[in-house]
Amino acid sequence: MSDIPFWQTKTLEDMTDAEWESLCDGCGQCCLHKLMDEDTDEIYFTNVACRQLNIKTCQCRNYERRFEYEPDCIKLTRENLPTFEWLPVTCAYRLLAEGKPLPKWHPLIVGSKAAMHAERISVRHIAVKESEVVDWQDHILNKPDWAQ
């Protein structure tokens, strides 16, 4: 049996569903709402978390049934990955699609999410609950480093 991790030997297309799912580092960046300018199609990042995101753990409260609770939730697949230009530069799906390695803090490498949180990759330090937002425009972020 090889000691080389699956993400270094398989393409995204060749990964099993379990391998595909395990690539997600659980940072929660995908679960922050984005606003789109209707005239320019420019995407603005906010710090407003989806109602299903547990901000402390950066995990979806209802992952298996998320589309029932959040019809606008978008499922990232092998087929639609190229259309998600807004994925963070730290996203394993994006990195592997671009032929780049996983970052040293990635949970698949270090075995836990602690390093990711320590590096402030996760949204737990910036996210606010959707229910607490009055004016969404007040929550637009300058383009975060992770979105470059």
Curated annotation (Swiss-Prot):
Signal peptide: none annotated. It comes from the Bacteria. InterPro entries: Puta_zinc/iron-chelating_dom, UCP006173. Belongs to the UPF0260 family. This is UPF0260 protein YcgN. The gene is ycgN.
